[in-house]
């Protein structure tokens, strides 16, 4: 999940943490903070980690800040946005896009920002795989 601390979707951290707690025996959630959209992740890595813990009690991994779009896109997100999947490819449109990979690292689903962590479409995709 590409994340940001000052975004309208930031409260999704709460749902992501709940999902992680409920599914952590078979699901790993990893947050990748990025400042690509509206400067909504201006903090340092330490500030981001503190924010996530203090405001949302996040226990899933929060990585160092990355770029998810543009000339300096991180290799992982370059792959995630170009890899063939049943949903769509292309640039990330905003913070909190979600990518579901299987246990072999195959990209199987991608969800736009508006899909909440507790949405049935996301939960069904997790259960199916």
Language model feature labels by segment:
Residues 2, 26-44, 59-70:
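Thiol-based oxidoreductase modules, predominantly thioredoxin-like and allied folds used
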Residues 5-35, 52-56:
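Conserved helix-turn-beta segment immediately C-terminal to the redox Cys motif
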Residues 7-10, 38-39, 70, 116-120:
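Loop/helix-junction capping segments adjacent to catalytic residues or to phosphate/diphosphate-binding pockets
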Residues 12-15, 44, 48, 72-73, ...:
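Stable alpha-helical elements in mature extracytoplasmic
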Residues 17, 30, 64-65, 69, ...:
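Predominantly extracellular/lumenal beta-strand repeat domains
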Residues 46-95:
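Short, internal strand/loop/helix patches
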Residues 75-78, 82-129:
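Thiol-/selenol-based redox modules, centered on thioredoxin-like
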């Amino acid at each position: 999940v590409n994340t940001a601390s000052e975004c309208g979707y930031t409260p999704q951290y709460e749902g992501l943490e709940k999902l992680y707690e409920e599914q952590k025996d078979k699901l790993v959630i990893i947050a990748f903070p990025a400042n690509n959209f509206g400067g909504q992740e201006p903090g340092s890595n330490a500030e981001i980690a503190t924010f996530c813990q203090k405001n949302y009690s996040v226990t899933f991994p929060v990585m160092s800040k990355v770029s998810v779009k543009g000339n300096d896109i991180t290799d992982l997100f370059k792959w995630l946005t170009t890899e063939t999947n049943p949903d769509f490819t292309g640039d990330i449109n905003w913070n909190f896009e979600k990518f579901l990979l299987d246990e072999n690292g195959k990209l199987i689903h991608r969800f736009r920002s508006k899909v909440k962590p507790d949405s049935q479409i996301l939960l069904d995709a997790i259960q199916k795989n």
